[in-house]
Amino acid sequence: MVLFTDQNRKELKRRFRKDLKKEILFSLFTTNSSLLTIPGRECPDCPQAQELLEEICALSPKIDLKIYNYFDALESRRQYDIDKIPAIVTESEGANRLVFYGVPQGYQFPVFLEGMERMSRDVSSLANTTRKGFSKVDRLVTLRIFVSSNSITAASVAKLAQAAALESRLISAEIIDVNGFPELRRAYNVS
């Protein structure tokens, strides 16, 4: 399945050539695709997440992808603190990591790309007073943002959470697509 049109690819290639300075690594936690599904190990969004990242990686030599089988990569799961799939960890040298649970699509896709680009450029989108405020954080904080692909408000909040995480190593941002995790939607009463 092709996710991007030729025009989309052309625009993204241009954008990545211009905006990516440092290399980006995506670590995808997924399951092995198989015709046999083991109960409790289903992940209907995993193939789409992998396909999306593979298409993005094909657009720039500065973007790489490492794929982990969630059920086999216990040490890596602990290292990245991953507890559900699909999980996309975005990293770049010298920057804090960003985590997206699910498939970044709809309004979340541009936020996903902007986070990656800001990370690669070491550029903050925050005002200096806000940056100073985040520099005063003195303990670990996890910002868990629940989003859906059709919510522009959630996209704005996710963008701010990513900016905060890129500002301080003590702040981590987890963006969670509630459409892919209905049990979390119910548990946290997300509408």
Language-model features, listed with the residues they occupy:
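N-terminal, well-ordered alpha-helical segments
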Residues: 47-54, 75, 86, 110, ...
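Thioredoxin-like thiol-disulfide oxidoreductase module
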Residues: 61-94, 170-191
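Generic structural signal for well-ordered secondary structure
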Residues: 46-49, 70, 81-82, 105
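Catalytic cores of large soluble enzymes that bind and process phosphate-bearing ligands
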Residues: 4, 41, 45, 104
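Non-catalytic, surface beta->alpha helical segment in thiol-disulfide oxidoreductase systems
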Residues: 87-123
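Local sequence-structure signature of Cys/Sec-based thiol-disulfide redox active-site neighborhoods
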Residues: 14-59, 134-169, 173
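Short, surface-exposed acidic/glycine-rich loop or hinge patches that mediate macromolecular interfaces
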Residues: 71, 103, 148-151, 178-179
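N-terminal leader/targeting and pre-domain segments
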Residues: 1-25, 29, 108-138
